[in-house]
């Protein structure tokens, strides 16, 4: 206290020392404008007056002296010519033409100016006779005169309009300093016109009367100020005049002119205390951080804010204190703000100076002091008398200590299903939310070492502690139903402590985690998959969906969150920052695709539609929601309900009639309705009608009719002349049909020959197989998509039925992928060899992950089209995808596809062998085939693509697969498969069909993966060490075929299930006999050859024992 008083007592001495530093601004003449404009014409006579420049005085008695610069310059300050064309009267400031200028003068300057047709030059005019450098021309002691040099003669006097004679070409404004003697600052007349057109009379008169400080001479040629102006009273004026033009005739025209006049400021106003307050009191308690503003005092100055370069020199502030602790702890910061004040109904600029007393360092919670501080403020440019520019500000400061206190006890509930990093509550010392510069550390001391399920982390924003789940296993222990802790809060600087008890009650029951759920809730893009999964930070074990408002780019965007209470909220808190998977919407420093507004340092501040993130790949997407408004109102829904009710009644009546008819009518022999997984022996074909029901087979009368006797109606649109078709080598064959390579002449109007593939029946085929071929023919007529095999035509008359379809150069996708594995890096470099017949000449480059994703995307687009056409494929697999030139994917083998315009599912209740490992659960157990069961198969196809043609579920026999799938077992992620691709597979393998994505959504997800895919897939490195993945001991084509009696069948069938018997892609070069003779297990011999390595076919074909198991399920 004594030190502060003694410091204030020395104020008088300091003021005396500072007074000699006060000075006055230099005085001098100045120009009223910083630029003048006029026109020059070719052949203007020498001596033509051009314009006046005017100088105003700083003090009475000053006489101006004008001097021209030595050179003419271009607008880009290029020196063009020595100035011998323009002269000036050094006393009056009149500029006139020294010599007449011709076209050569203009051309000479134009060339030096870069050849621009519009030539503008300028020269500089200085005040005073002393020499100045031309590069230092600045207002107020120098001005520039610009001339538009026109390559034409002076216009005819009769061509001028009144506006041309009154209004200058360029806007004119004036600058007048306050408190200066009156003087002339403008000459109205355009001197060249007055000189060259004496018959035109132009006169002026001022408007506004005596209220304005301007006047004209008797002829009103020159305008002057009437008195010294005061900027603090009025800063801007408008000079208005009336221009009267009279020509040789009697007509007169008037034009009104206006010019702005700005009064420039000088430092003639002393600073004063704002509101008369020069003392401030402050208390330093909870805000103790360096940079904290302790108190503020304001100083008002009627003068304008100085330029930034002048501010530090003009205004100084000094902390007057002899206390070293105060000097080290506090500093003063000065910040001026321009403000407007009203004076006589005029807005005038002024300055409000803010002087802030700021902590120069952080203070500990134990610091305690009381002191008085004085700050000297000096306006060093003040032009008034004495020490009017000096003020002293006073600050009374009290620094108080801080005591740490916690409440006696805390109590929180926690859900047993909570995931790691789930936030359950906060602990906070008293007033912690007001702390700044105080560092508190929280710790938990558990009462039992077996129940340490919680952790605590200190929030740097409000010095609170956030409690979170750190060990989910401890939550599930029976003895940990009530967690007891001691919370200890410690000040890091002084080590002072306080503590309280904490009781956390564990509630709820455990739940089974969904298969295939991502680690982060933010990955989920759709509400159903969000709410059925959990993720890091979820307090309930399930993610929460936040539905946005859908209004453009908004902070309330739709997203999946562990807890909408904390995520996303635009702030990455202390818990969320521990793992990017908790809340990437707030914390991820990622690339954001789509409409968004990025957070200040991280996360998404605002987004468009639905925003989801992939933390491992550091990417976020904000895309529109796939939603539509209500399509039907209440009346519409009532009508639809009534119609559906009527339809249901009609269907029930129809079913009753049909059942009654079958009960009393003749029953033809039909196949068994039991679902078995074996194939009838050769010669007993299985087929379906277009409605999806089993046709009569085996002993059906129509199947005994020769194919040749069946008359096919001709379709002129698709009929192709048989003579124009030349058949070639066989590409693949099945039991009753084959595919051959062919050339077609003038196909679809094309010139020359076109390579095609032709599907046909073998001689042993029956009408059942012919109907299958006709069914595919009729189906292919309806489809047209770049990723579905294309029908060109058919030969249906005067011979066997031939279907002409698109030729796929590289065969099946499965063979293409496997052969790509064999290629390896050596093939890319040209050193490899190929023996496979599946690929003749593929692109000579190694497959990249982008290629594989592209294959999947193409297939998904084709399946999306088929789904929109209401077609179910039922056998989607890599073996049934063909690869055309340019690596174009083509969906083929529609022998099983069924038109579902009438019904969305096909129930298969017939005998026949099926591809178990590609089938959906509902197809295996309930015989239901829908577009969503195709989605399941597509997931297996994705697995085949990523593993380059691997066999699904390697090493697992089909009879075990049923129970594994039912209990939630799914294939594991292959080594070279991305997390995002594997998540898509798992979504396709959801047990409930309605929770699987549709093909449209799958296409969108694959499009994103294609954009993000950059790295090459190392085919050699991706080869699994387990040979089962690719061979299972045998290739799929070499698997044994057995009938219902376990009798082996000939290996002439394709590598698809038996209903695809017509168009398989088996190798035509297979040997006719087995290299190793085999006997049956029962010791009986067969008349059919087998192969030694024919066991893996069971990997996707169910054995008779499994068939019996499925019969049990049926019953």
From Swiss-Prot:
Q: Source gene?
A: Ret
Oxidoreductase among the record's keywords?
no
Where do the annotations place Ca(2+) 1 binding?
Answer: 178-179, 230, 232
Q: Which residues bind Ca(2+) 3?
A: 267, 269, 301, 303, 379
Which reactions appear under catalytic activity for this entry?
L-tyrosyl-[protein] + ATP = O-phospho-L-tyrosyl-[protein] + ADP + H(+)
Organism, per UniProt?
Mus musculus
Chain spans, region Cadherin-like region 4 (CLD4): 407-508
| Protein name, per record | Proto-oncogene tyrosine-protein kinase receptor Ret
Q: What is its EC number?
A: 2.7.10.1
List the Gene3D superfamilies hit by this protein, alphabetically: Cadherins, Phosphorylase Kinase, domain 1, Transferase(Phosphotransferase) domain 1
Q: How is it modified after translation?
A: Autophosphorylated on C-terminal tyrosine residues upon ligand stimulation. Proteolytically cleaved by caspase-3. The soluble RET kinase fragment is able to induce cell death. The extracellular cell-membrane anchored RET cadherin fragment accelerates cell adhesion in sympathetic neurons.
Is the Transcription regulation keyword given for this protein?
A: no
Q: What compartments host this protein? A: Cell membrane; Endosome membrane
């Amino acid at each position: 206290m004594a030190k502060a008083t003694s410091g204030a007592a020395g104020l008088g001495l300091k003021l005396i020392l500072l007074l000699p530093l006060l000075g006055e601004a230099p005085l001098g003449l100045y120009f009223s404008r910083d630029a003048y404009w006029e026109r020059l014409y070719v052949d203007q006579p020498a001596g033509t007056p051009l314009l006046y420049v005017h100088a105003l005085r700083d003090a009475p008695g000053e006489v101006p002296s004008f001097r021209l610069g030595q050179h003419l310059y271009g607008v880009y300050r290029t020196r063009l010519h020595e100035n011998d064309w323009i002269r000036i009267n050094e006393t009056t400031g009149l500029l006139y033409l020294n010599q007449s200028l011709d076209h050569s003068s203009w051309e000479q300057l134009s060339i030096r100016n870069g050849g621009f047709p519009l030539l503008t030059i300028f020269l500089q005019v200085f005040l005073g006779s002393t020499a100045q450098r031309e590069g230092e021309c600045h207002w107020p002691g120098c001005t520039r005169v610009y001339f538009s040099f026109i390559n034409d003669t002076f216009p005819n006097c009769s061509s001028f309009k009144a506006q041309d004679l009154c209004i200058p070409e360029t806007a004119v404004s004036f600058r007048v300093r306050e408190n200066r003697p009156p003087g002339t600052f403008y000459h109205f007349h355009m001197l060249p016109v007055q000189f060259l057109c004496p018959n035109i009379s132009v006169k002026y008169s001022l408007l506004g009367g005596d209220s304005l400080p301007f006047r004209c001479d008797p002829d009103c040629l020159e305008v002057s100020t009437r008195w010294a102006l005061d900027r603090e009273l009025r800063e801007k004026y408008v000079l208005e005049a009336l221009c009267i033009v009279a020509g040789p005739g009697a007509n007169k025209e008037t034009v009104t002119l206006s010019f702005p006049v700005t009064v420039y400021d000088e430092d003639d106003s002393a600073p004063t205390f704002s509101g008369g307050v020069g003392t401030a009191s402050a208390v330093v308690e909870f805000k103790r951080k360096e940079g904290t503003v302790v108190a503020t005092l304001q100083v008002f100055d009627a003068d304008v804010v100085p330029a930034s370069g002048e501010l530090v020199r003009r205004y100084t502030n000094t902390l007057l204190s002899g206390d070293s602790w105060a000097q080290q702890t506090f500093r003063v910061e000065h910040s001026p703000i321009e403000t407007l004040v009203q004076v006589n109904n005029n807005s005038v600029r002024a300055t409000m100076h803010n002087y802030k007393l700021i902590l120069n360092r952080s203070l500990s919670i134990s610091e305690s002091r009381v002191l008085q501080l004085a700050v000297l403020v000096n306006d060093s440019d003040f032009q008034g008398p004495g020490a009017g520019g000096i003020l002293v500000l006073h600050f009374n400061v009290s620094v108080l200590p801080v005591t740490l206190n916690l409440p006696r006890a805390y109590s929180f509930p926690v859900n047993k299903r909570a995931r790691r990093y789930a936030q359950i509550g906060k602990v906070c010392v008293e007033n912690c939310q007001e702390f700044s510069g105080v560092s508190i550390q929280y710790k938990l001391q558990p009462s039992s070492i077996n129940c340490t399920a919680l952790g605590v982390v200190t929030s740097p924003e409000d010095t609170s502690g956030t409690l979170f789940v750190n060990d989910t296993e401890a939550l599930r222990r029976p003895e940990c139903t009530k967690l007891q802790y001691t919370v200890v809060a410690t000040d890091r600087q002084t080590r002072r402590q306080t503590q309280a008890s904490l009781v956390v009650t564990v509630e709820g029951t455990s739940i089974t985690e969904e298969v295939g759920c991502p680690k982060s809730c933010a990955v989920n893009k759709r509400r159903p998959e969000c709410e059925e999964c959990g993720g890091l930070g979820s307090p309930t074990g399930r993610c929460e969906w936040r539905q946005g408002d859908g209004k453009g780019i908004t902070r309330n965007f739709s997203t999946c969150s562990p807890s909408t209470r904390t995520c996303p909220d635009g702030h990455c808190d202390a818990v969320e920052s521990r793992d990017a998977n908790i809340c990437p919407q707030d914390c991820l420093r990622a690339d954001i695709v789509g409409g968004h507004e990025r957070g200040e340092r991280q996360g998404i501040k605002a987004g468009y539609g639905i925003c989801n993130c992939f933390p491992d790949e550091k990417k976020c997407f904000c895309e529109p929601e796939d939603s539509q408004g209500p399509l039907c109102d209440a009346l519409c829904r009532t009508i639809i309900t009534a119609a559906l009710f009527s339809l249901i009644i009609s269907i029930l009546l129809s079913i009753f009639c049909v059942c009654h008819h079958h009960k009393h009518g003749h029953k033809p022999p039909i196949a068994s309705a039991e679902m078995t997984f074996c194939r009838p022996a050769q010669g007993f074909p299985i087929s379906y009608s277009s409605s999806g029901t089993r046709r009569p087979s085996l002993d059906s009368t129509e199947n005994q009719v020769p194919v040749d006797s069946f008359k096919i109606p001709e379709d002129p649109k698709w009929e192709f002349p048989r003579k124009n078709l030349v058949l070639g080598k066989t590409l693949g064959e099945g039991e009753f049909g084959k595919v051959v390579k062919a050339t077609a002449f003038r196909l679809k109007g094309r010139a020359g020959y076109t390579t095609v593939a032709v599907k046909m029946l073998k001689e042993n085929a029956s009408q059942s197989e012919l109907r299958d071929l006709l069914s595919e023919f009729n189906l292919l007529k309806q489809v047209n998509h770049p990723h579905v095999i294309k029908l060109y035509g058919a030969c249906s008359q005067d011979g066997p039925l031939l279907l002409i379809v698109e030729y796929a150069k590289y065969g099946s996708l499965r063979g293409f992928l496997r052969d790509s594995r064999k290629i390896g890096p050596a093939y890319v470099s040209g050193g490899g060899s190929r023996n496979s017949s599946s690929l003749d000449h593929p692109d000579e480059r190694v497959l990249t992950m982008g290629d594989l994703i592209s294959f999947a995307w193409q297939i998904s687009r084709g399946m999306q089209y088929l789904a929109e056409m209401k077609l179910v494929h039922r056998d989607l697999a890599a073996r049934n995808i063909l690869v055309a030139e340019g690596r174009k994917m083509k969906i083929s083998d529609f022998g099983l596809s069924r038109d579902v315009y009438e019904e969305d599912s096909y129930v298969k209740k017939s005998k026949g062998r099926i591809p178990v490992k590609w089938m959906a659960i509902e197809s295996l157990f309930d015989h239901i085939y829908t577009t969503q069961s195709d989605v399941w198969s597509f997931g297996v196809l994705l697995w085949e693509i990523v593993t380059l043609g691997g066999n699904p579920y390697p090493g697992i026999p089909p009879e075990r697969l049923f129970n594994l799938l039912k209990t939630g077992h799914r294939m594991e992620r292959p080594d070279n498969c991305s997390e995002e691709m594997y998540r898509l597979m798992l979504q396709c393998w959801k047990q409930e069909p309605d929770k699987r994505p549709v093909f449209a959504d799958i296409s969108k997800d694959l499009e994103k993966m294609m954009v993000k895919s950059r790295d090459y897939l190392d085919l050699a490195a991706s080869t699994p060490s387990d040979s089962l993945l690719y061979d299972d001991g045998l290739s799929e084509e070499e698997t044994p075929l057995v009938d219902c009696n376990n009798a082996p069948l000939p290996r002439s069938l394709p590598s698809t299930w038996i209903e695809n018997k017509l168009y398989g892609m088996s190798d035509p070069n297979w040997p006719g006999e087995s290299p190793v003779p085999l006997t049956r297990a029962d010791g009986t011999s067969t008349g059919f050859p087998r192969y030694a390595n024919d066991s893996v076919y069971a990997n996707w074909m169910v054995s008779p024992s499994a068939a019996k198991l499925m019969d049990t399920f049926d019953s």
